[in-house]
Swiss-Prot record:
This is Sigma factor-binding protein Crl. Pfam families: Crl. InterPro entries: Tscrpt_reg_Crl, Tscrpt_reg_Crl_sf. It comes from Salmonella arizonae (strain ATCC BAA-731 / CDC346-86 / RSK2980). It is found in: Cytoplasm. Binds to the sigma-S subunit of RNA polymerase, activating expression of sigma-S-regulated genes. Stimulates RNA polymerase holoenzyme formation and may bind to several other sigma factors, such as sigma-70 and sigma-32. The gene is crl. Keywords: Activator, Cytoplasm, Transcription, Transcription regulation. GO terms for biological process: positive regulation of DNA-templated transcription. One of its GO terms (cellular component) is cytoplasm. Residues 99-122 are annotated as: Essential for activity. Belongs to the Crl family.
Length: 133
């Protein structure tokens, strides 16, 4: 499948995978890509498959000459689902912001190298993290 930008989807998936353990290929559809980061374990006592994590997820959509994004912070529960919830612990918020900024920078640099821009979605109003200089 070729995206509106003219780049084959399979090539983009390969490049996105090289950015790190962020892309969830099974949740990517058509011209949309899904990334997430399980940044902070809520409680290490349960078995690994039963643990919950604080983290973020990002949806990326291919446009003609750019990709648009929206992201959320929240809880990745033991069933493997994301829920947007407020996070009260300062250290956790700082870790999430750091990992999101790091990923955003890598993603932006990759897209620029391909002649594409990275911009917030028109319907993405909430920007709690300063992602670009």
């Amino acid at each position: 499948m070729t995206l509106p930008s003219g780049h084959p989807k399979s090539r983009l998936i390969k490049k996105f995978t090289a950015l790190g353990p962020y892309i969830r290929e099974g949740q990517c559809e058509d011209n949309r890509f899904f990334f997430d980061c399980l940044a902070v374990c809520v409680n290490v006592k349960p078995a690994p498959e039963k643990r919950e994590f604080w983290g973020w997820w990002m949806e990326l959509e291919a446009q003609e000459k750019s990709f648009t994004y929206r992201y959320q912070f929240g809880l990745f529960d033991k069933e493997g689902n994301w829920t947007a919830v407020p996070i009260k612990e300062t250290e956790v918020v700082e870790r999430l912001e750091y990992t999101l900024r790091e990923f955003h920078g890598k993603l932006r640099d990759l897209l620029i190298s391909m002649g594409l821009a990275l911009e917030p979605s028109d319907d993405f109003n909430d920007e709690p993290v300063k992602l670009s200089a």
